[in-house]
């Protein structure tokens, strides 16, 4: 649907709204995310400003170069994205809720074009998250040692409630926490029914030299863990209250 008020040749006089379904955009070579099967409604009432209300089911987001597992599948994505494409483009995310087999994540915040990869300020909560899947949502820049350890050590668990925050210039990510005013990266949550291998090791399992994590070789597995996972900046802390 489209309408205009005044001179039809003046794009600023136009307003429109439209529904879209199954929108797919491949990831770009410069690392821009891609999407598949996104649905919702887009509208505008002011020049250079757009509002997208998401109502998506069974969609995929692609984050090449950001996560080890760049393809993320979701059973639903809802919420509002507002775009102001003026001299300094800015996107505002409101009540975004993403549901997958790994849990439910909610968030709100902004991204602003401030040069380079821009500046982000987004935070939210997580519910019912599979602890063994946490490594999939830690960005590559956290470093291979940390990613390897989390993937191998955290074998099971349920994060009933958690929170997360990403704030600062993305070119400086991951912020090490020494100067919180420059940027902050945080993921933390309480874990129940956890299972963990504190000293995982790799070993060859085929003639080709392929390796996998060997569980419990150096230390007995801990089970029925109740504790807390805390990732902040480039640091990681896992605290067990009982096991």
Describe the residue ranges of each PLM region.
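Short strand-coil-strand connectors
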Residues: 99-101
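Membrane-proximal interfacial segments on either side of biological membranes
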Residues: 1-73, 77-80, 84-92, 103-243
């Amino acid at each position: 649907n489209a309408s205009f008020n005044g001179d039809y040749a003046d794009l600023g006089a136009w307003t429109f709204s439209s529904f879209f379904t199954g929108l797919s955009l491949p990831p770009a070579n410069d690392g821009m995310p891609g999407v598949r099967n996104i649905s919702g409604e887009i509208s505008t009432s002011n020049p250079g400003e757009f509002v997208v209300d998401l109502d998506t089911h069974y969609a995929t987001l692609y984050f090449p170069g950001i996560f080890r597992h760049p393809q993320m599948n979701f059973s639903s994505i809802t919420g509002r994205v507002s775009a102001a494409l003026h001299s300094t483009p800015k996107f505002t995310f409101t009540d975004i809720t993403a549901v997958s087999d790994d849990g439910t994540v909610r968030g709100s915040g902004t991204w602003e074009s401030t040069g380079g990869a821009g500046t982000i300020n987004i935070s939210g909560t997580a519910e019912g998250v599979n602890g063994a899947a946490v490594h999939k949502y830690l960005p590559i820049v956290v470093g291979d040692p940390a990613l390897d350890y989390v993937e191998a050590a955290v074998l099971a668990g349920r994060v009933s409630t958690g929170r997360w925050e990403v704030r600062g210039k993305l070119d400086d990510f991951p912020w090490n926490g020494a100067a919180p005013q420059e940027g902050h990266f945080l993921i933390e949550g309480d874990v129940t029914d956890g299972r963990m291998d504190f000293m995982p090791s790799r070993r060859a399992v085929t003639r080709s030299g392929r390796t996998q994590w060997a569980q419990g070789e150096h230390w007995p597995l801990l089970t029925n863990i109740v504790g807390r996972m805390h990732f902040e900046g480039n640091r990681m802390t896992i605290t067990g209250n009982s096991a």
